[in-house]
Amino acid sequence: ISMHAEKRFMAPINVEEFYPLDDSEQDGHKTHIVMSWLLGPTNDLHASLTAELLAGVLLEDSASPLQQALETCDLGTAPSPLCGLDNSNKEMTFVCGMEGSTPEDTQAVEDLIISTLQDVVKEGVPQESIEAVLHQLEMEQREIGGGSYPYGLELILDATTTAVHYGAALAALSLTPVLEQLRSDI
C-alpha cells in the first residue's frame, strides 16, 4: 500500500457539492459551509498532538473562540458536525463551518471563521484554557479503560494510522516526551 501526499494548491479552492433532500425538507436551510486546512503528516506524533491541542483550544466547548463564534452567529443552525481535526489519513486536516445555512451565506461564514482566527492570533487565548485542553488531551491519550475495546487493542488501533503510513508505530505510543514538550511549549 502506498499513500501519496495530498495535492497542494497555490490558492484556496471552492468546491460545491449537492445531496438529495426529501420533499418535506425543502426549507432552504440545508447547506453545509465548511472550510478546511491541510496540516502536517499524521505519523509525526508531536505535530499530531499539537494539532489536537490547537483544535481543542479553538473548538473544545462553547467558551472556545471558534466554537463560540459559530454557535452565536445567525448564519446557520449549528456548527457543522464535520468541525474538528481529522488525523486518520496520511495528512491531517482541520475543518470548521456551519450547517443549516444557505448558499448566500458562504462568504459571511468564511469571513466569520477567518476573522475569529485572526482575533485569536492577535489577542491570544487565556493560558488556563490552553492548559485545561492540554490536561484533557493528556488524560484522553493515557486513558486505560475508557474505550469500548480492551486496552491492548486500543493501543494497536492508536498506532495503526502511523504504521499504515510507514511511520514508527512504537514511537507513536511514546507519549510522555511529546506531552512534556507540549507542556513546555505552552
Predicted regions and their residues:
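C-terminal, helix-dominated tail/subdomain
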Residues: G145-V178
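Segments forming glycine/polar-rich beta-alpha architectures that bind adenosine-containing cofactors
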Residues: P177-I186
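Non-catalytic beta-strand/loop surface segments
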Residues: I1-L45, G56-Q107, D111, P126-E154, ...
